[in-house]
């Protein structure tokens, strides 16, 4: 959600996230593609809720860098309240799995890092947004 007058991303970075979303063939609402990058740079804020400091969100986003395009799509869905929170959160998980598959390839289940990403990281992120995202979803409704 656009609470800050200071953007988290530049317009160029938003376009790079869009390119990555195309590369990974992520599922995204029309708003993600239709809105101008200069607007979305205030909407997309990386991983974590708006109520967190930028420092915390940057740290988490850096730790989960591979999934950044999925987070940008999720931010757009929350900001414009597209569909339902549950549908948005499920799309985030599906998009993270697409990224995981592409990055770890055929050997994804044979690599320890691949298994950790799929069995720990992705479910943890999904649980966090499914449980804690309600407040952010409501905040978007009240703006």
Question: What kind of feature is each model-predicted range?
Answer:
Residues 1-143:
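Extended terminal accessory/targeting regions
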């Amino acid at each position: 959600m656009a609470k800050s007058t200071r953007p988290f991303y530049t317009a160029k970075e938003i376009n790079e996230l869009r390119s990555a979303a195309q590369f990974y063939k992520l599922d995204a609402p029309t708003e993600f593609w239709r809105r101008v990058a200069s607007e979305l740079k205030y909407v997309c804020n990386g991983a974590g809720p708006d109520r967190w400091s930028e420092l915390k969100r940057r740290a988490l986003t850096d730790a989960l860098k591979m999934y950044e395009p999925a987070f940008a799509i999720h931010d757009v869905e929350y900001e414009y309240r597209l569909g339902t929170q549950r549908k948005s959160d499920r799309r985030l998980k599906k998009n993270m799995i697409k990224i995981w598959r592409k990055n770890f390839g055929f050997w994804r289940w044979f690599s320890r890092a691949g298994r950790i990403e799929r069995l720990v990281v992705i479910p943890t992120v999904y649980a966090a947004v499914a449980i804690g995202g309600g407040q952010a979803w409501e905040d978007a409704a009240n703006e």
